[in-house]
């Protein structure tokens, strides 16, 4: 028997980001009212009659005066506080695959603390611990854009041998929809990643249709660049230097949320 999806309003924090923008487009195909929210919006009012809340606020690359705590933890605390007075039946949160409460990296630590806050809100929560997310060729997103060649070259942080399982943006969007609106989907915390594990160098080659040259950056130099280059931070460099490889069956998780995972080579084949 087919379970009827929730048809009430869906509130989306951080709705202007890579995934939030795509999610809003997808939600507009459904009968649900979409409520995109920014930092200054009244969350309690927006959540007041919402069926579901999707918390996207957060960033690996905050711009001053924003901070890692303000962007990744304080926004989650505000969402959790507003949820406590809301009739919402689900809250969905995108965390990061290697988030840990004891992490020395403040981005990873605040992501883990944000998870705790949302689990404690009283609203059934679905938390996806995502690997690096990439978009299609016409909207690659910040991570993929860093691996697209300029003048035939790609500069890699570290040796390029670090491992990742990049996750397609539209697969994330579909999983969020099912988690938020389908009452039959489970709650809990789930690792979510793409179907193929590869090195950072292989990722770069798959994103570029023409032959490219890659050049690695020694780890110590990469960490120094994270402190002096305005577009980098120590936390971002640390994340990009590390492996992000799932230890759970992500294909099974995808199926539980109505998703058949896309392969990077197929998504970017037509570029």
Language-model features: locations:
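Residues forming the Rossmann-fold NAD(P)(H) cofactor-binding site
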Residues: 20-21, 73, 112
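Oxidoreductase cofactor-interface core, primarily capturing Rossmann-like NAD(P)-dependent enzymes
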Residues: 103-207
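NAD(P)H-binding glycine-rich loop region in Rossmannoid oxidoreductase-like domains
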Residues: 39-78, 82-85, 96-101
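SDR active-site strand-loop-helix element
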Residues: 13, 56-57, 91-97, 128-130
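Terminal hydrophobic/aromatic helix or amphipathic segment near a protein terminus
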Residues: 205-245
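Amphipathic terminal alpha-helices
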Residues: 2-3, 245-271
């Amino acid at each position: 028997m087919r379970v009827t999806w929730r048809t009430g309003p869906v509130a989306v924090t951080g709705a202007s980001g890579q995934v939030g923008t795509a999610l809003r487009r997808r939600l507009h195909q459904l009968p649900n009212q979409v409520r995109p929210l920014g930092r200054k919006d009244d969350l309690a009012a927006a959540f007041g009659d919402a069926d579901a809340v999707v918390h996207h606020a957060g960033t690996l690359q905050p711009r001053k005066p924003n901070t890692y705590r303000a962007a990744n933890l304080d926004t989650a605390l505000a969402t959790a506080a507003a949820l406590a007075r809301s009739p919402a039946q689900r809250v969905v949160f995108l965390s990061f695959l290697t988030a840990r409460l004891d992490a020395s990296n403040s981005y990873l630590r605040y992501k883990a603390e944000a998870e705790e806050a949302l689990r404690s809100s009283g609203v059934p929560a679905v938390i996806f611990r995502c690997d690096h997310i990439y978009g299609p060729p016409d909207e690659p997103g910040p991570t993929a854009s860093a691996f697209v060649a300029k003048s035939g070259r790609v500069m890699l942080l570290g040796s390029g041998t670090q491992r990742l399982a990049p996750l397609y943006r539209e697969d994330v969007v579909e999983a969020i929809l099912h988690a938020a609106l389908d009452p039959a989907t489970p709650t809990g915390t789930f690792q979510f990643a793409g179907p193929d594990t590869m090195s950072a160098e292989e990722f770069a080659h798959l994103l570029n249709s023409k032959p490219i040259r890659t050049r690695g950056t020694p780890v110590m130099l990469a960490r120094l660049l994270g402190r002096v280059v305005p577009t980098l931070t120590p936390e971002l460099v640390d994340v990009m230097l590390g492996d992000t490889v799932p230890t759970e069956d992500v294909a099974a998780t995808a199926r539980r949320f109505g998703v058949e995972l896309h392969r990077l080579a197929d998504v970017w084949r037509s570029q």
